Amino acid sequence: MAVSARPARAPRGPDKVKKDKAAQTSGPRQGSQMGKLLGFEWTDVSSWERLVTLLNRPTDPASLAVFRFLFGLMMVLDIPQERGLSSLDRRYLDGLEVCRFPLLDALQPLPLDWMYLVYTIMFLGALGMMLGLCYRISCVLFLLPYWYVFLLDKTSWNNHSYLYGLLAFQLTFVDAHHYWSVDGLLRARKRNAHVPLWNYAVLRGQIFIVYFIAGIKKLDADWVEGYSMEYLSRHWLFSPFKLVLSEEMTSLLVVHWCGLLLDLSAGFLLFFDASRPIGFVFVSYFHCMNSQLFSIGMFPYVMLASSPLFCSPEWPRKLVAHCPKKLQELLPLRTAPQPSTSCMYKRSRARGSQKPGLRHQLSTAFTLLYLLEQLFLPYSHFLTQGYNNWTNGLYGYSWDMMVHSRSHQHVKITYRDGRTGELGYLNPGVFTQSRRWKDHADMLKQYATCLSRLLPKYNVTEPQIYFDIWVSINDRFQQRIFDPRVDIVQAAWSPFQRTPWLQPLLMDLSPWRTKLQEIKSSLDNHTEVVFIADFPGLHLENFVSEDLGNTSIQLLQGEVTVELVAEQKNQTLQEGEKMQLPAGEYHKVYTVSSSPSCYMYIYVNTTEVALEQDLAYLQELKEKVENGSETGPLPPELQPLLEGEVKGGPEPTPLVQTFLRRQQRLQEIERRRNAPFYERFVRFLLRKLFIFRRSFLMTCISLRNLALGRPSLEQLAQEVTYANLRPFEPAGEPSPVNTDSSNPNPPEPDSHPVHSEF
């Protein structure tokens, strides 16, 4: 599969150099159909010795070196951004009371200045990897800090960050510095030398697994039926498809089905020579789209850089051969590679054939074991059952990319003083820098344990912590994910046993999604709906905001009793029945049926509707005055409508101020949308420049602190203020709310107010 490589050969051209004899006899016999298709014969894998010979066959190092350079460059760019160097002081500020989520509780961050040193070592390692300078050492200098930072925070885990660590691990063992490297300039033995075929096989196999396993995971019914990413088709990138398809069909056919087919076929398309051009077109288009659809850092570009690994290894030499001769002097060598001790070469019959050495056998075993391990890990969740929730395993190493989308409607954290019995509530996410803990039992256990250590500082002794978390996955009902009656501080949790306080996903209710969509589509623009499913014996305590002047609850399945707390009244609802809920009051919904209940809140934000009507009136009045159809004078408090801003005179009403702010915001959006390409590109570069500038300055400050000691707090404050300046951005340019592109948990959109009062 991953060993399709032709024997190394020099490119054709006027400066062609003959191959060395060893290389001439090292290639596979490609006379048969199998040899032409796969690059090796059946006899090459018919025994262990022949397999070792095949995987250690001399191969051109050119393509491997190009990937090394590009991957190192991507990591140099990634460290200040997604790895978080630019915002390191916000994450690991000394003395900060924060709950962290490492893989192992014993793994803790170093003091802030030392964390900057760790990131500096990682950055220098990535730079050395890119240049091929002290290559092995550079790979280790990048690899160890990378995995330390990665394992330090489970909330930032994702598939591509895991992939970076795997690729860096592989590059540590392969000979990617045998071409186009500083090491090659300094050591003639390393310069332009063959690499064994397994160097390509392990990298190709890894990329193939990423694509193929991602495709297999997308065979999930939710993905095939179009529920996983149903809102993605609203993006402007899918506008061409919506010329011939509806938005729903674009989501189903283009986003979901084409995404499934691409992941399943991408590895095969890239592997075979005949289909590789088609594969290049599809995967390049796919990754370019992903770079615009998602905030996933360097991942699309790393995958684009990995695609040429499937080409003939000598393709860079062919590219150099077509460059002008004056430019060729600055580019990598075109000459044929020299022999390397890492490879096995065929000798003449008279002298016999070379026997595999221990080094060759170990490298072959490493390749096979590594690829088998990568095939096993995505399906190893039966071993680590404690990390299984509604989806299997810790998110990041299963390649189930974008298969599950979640929305959190309601999160309540209750604490009880173990001595006094006093109850209280915590703001969800207090003492954390993330929100991913809501979906994972292992993180919830860590969070509860951390809260139990912090709350005694606030006069809460022996705290008991209870979580009531409502989640919808792939457009299902909102339902509880954990039992709200269990004290998580004392609850049992093991990485190798099923979590007993995890509530099951109500898969039997999945067919309701079609009906739920029909209900949504039947409502007008001002009416909102929230669908709830709850377990027998549990109840939901809720508060209806005073802004929601028209709120009702309707039962879809099962039986519930609704208690109006202030009125001390109860009403039981049967299937299809509905009742009005008073605004500004608490109520409780008890599930009294023997099976899960399903109901929905239907509400209208009357305050928002009235505001929209008033703003529409002001907009209409403004247009009438501007076109001359309104001849009467405006009251003084409405004069800012024409001027666009407040310029003395009577203070405008709050409504007018709201209208002016909305107008300014809409004008700014329109200006940015219609800005020329160069202006948007410059804005993009300035934002990136700020990230790299702040990363550099804060690193210098911390390294100075380690070397010379910390200065006074006043001087430190001045230095940090200078690092936070944006000297390159034009005046009046609004700064983004959060410049930390490393944050894997951006703020959630506002939840429906029916369930967000806690």
Curated annotation (Swiss-Prot):
Q: What is its main location?
A: endoplasmic reticulum
Task: Using the UniProt record, name the top-level EC class of this enzyme in a single word.
Answer: lyase
Query: Superkingdom, according to UniProt?
Result: Eukaryota
Disordered: annotated span:
1-34, 726-758
Enumerate the Cytoplasmic topological stretches. 2-60, 135-136, 314-361
The record's gene field reads GGCX
Q: What else is known?
A: The vitamin K-dependent protein substrates of carboxylase have usually a propeptide that binds to a high-affinity site on the carboxylase. CO(2), O(2) and reduced vitamin K are cosubstrates.
Keywords, in A-Z order: Acetylation, Disulfide bond, Endoplasmic reticulum, Lyase, Membrane, Transmembrane, Transmembrane helix
Q: Indicate where the modification N-acetylalanine is found in the sequence.
A: 2
Q: Which InterPro entries match?
A: HTTM-like, HTTM_dom, RmlC_Cupin_sf, VKG_COase, VKGC_lumenal_dom
Listed EC numbers: 4.1.1.90
* Catalytic activity line of the entry: 4-carboxy-L-glutamyl-[protein] + 2,3-epoxyphylloquinone + H2O + H(+) = phylloquinol + L-glutamyl-[protein] + CO2 + O2
The disulfide bonds in this chain are 99-450
Protein name (Swiss-Prot/TrEMBL): Vitamin K-dependent gamma-carboxylase
Q: Which Pfam families match?
A: HTTM, VKGC_lumenal_dom
